[in-house]
């Protein structure tokens, strides 16, 4: 059986765990990892793999797992499908999903590729389980509570703000599907909180 050659684009938490999942999957092989800095300061665990700064430097890639900050997924998906490579992502900006799907579907038709979008936890697996529960118990209440814990996506967004050195976003459940978000930031030297918020 021919193995599916997958590239991992981005090497934060999602990228690291994507590599681990691919290593455990008998029907996949890792075509390489794409990082902004390429193979400079290459992590030891990536020693067996080709690490590049552009997916075009990898050969025979069947699918790219987009492990980038969520707001960058649409651009990466568009660029990568133009190369004839399929994509998978965990895009989680709920209010933009339909627009992203529509635009990416047009790209996929043009390039004869496939893009699986928003295939993470929420939206994704959690959404599927919620719909199944609503089908099984249509008169019940289907709340989804998150936390307590760190929100990776919101932490990444907070860190991307000019003047922020580091940030942590926590999700605290209040019950009945309602939660509170607490964001902690460490400012860069000279930055003012009023300019960051």
Question: Each PLM stretch: what is its role?
Answer:
Residues 1-29:
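NAD(P)+-binding Rossmann beta1-loop-alpha1 motif at the extreme N-terminus of oxidoreductases
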Residues 9, 13, 17, 135-197:
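Active-site-lining helix/loop region of Rossmann-like oxidoreductase modules
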Residues 17, 24-45:
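NAD(P)-binding Rossmann-fold cofactor-contacting core
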Residues 51, 87, 114-115:
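Hydrophobic beta-strand scaffold residues
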Residues 53-82, 94-98:
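Beta-loop-alpha module in the N-terminal Rossmann-like domain of NAD(P)-dependent dehydrogenases
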Residues 91-115:
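Rossmann-fold NAD(P)-binding glycine/threonine-rich loop
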Residues 111-152:
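Adenosine-phosphate binding glycine-rich loop
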């Amino acid at each position: 059986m021919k193995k599916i050659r997958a590239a991992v684009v981005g090497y934060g938490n999602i990228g690291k765990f994507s590599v681990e999942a691919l290593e455990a999957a008998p029907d996949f092989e890792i075509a390489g990892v794409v990082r902004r800095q390429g193979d400079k300061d290459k992590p030891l665990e990536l020693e067996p793999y080709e690490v590049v700064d552009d997916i075009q430097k990898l050969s025979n890639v069947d699918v790219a797992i987009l492990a980038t900050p969520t707001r960058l997924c649409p651009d990466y998906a568009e660029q990568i499908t133009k190369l004839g490579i399929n994509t998978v992502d965990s895009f989680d900006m709920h209010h933009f999903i339909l627009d992203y799907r529509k635009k990416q579907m047009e790209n996929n038709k043009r390039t004869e590729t496939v893009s699986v979008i928003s295939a993470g936890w929420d939206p994704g697996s959690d959404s599927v389980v919620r719909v199944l529960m609503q089908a099984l118990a249509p008169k019940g209440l289907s709340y989804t509570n998150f936390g307590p814990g760190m929100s990776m996506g919101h932490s990444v967004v907070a860190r991307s703000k000019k003047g922020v050195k580091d940030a942590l976003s926590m999700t605290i459940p209040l019950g009945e599907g309602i939660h509170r978000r607490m964001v902690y930031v460490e400012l860069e030297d000279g930055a003012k909180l009023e300019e960051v918020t």
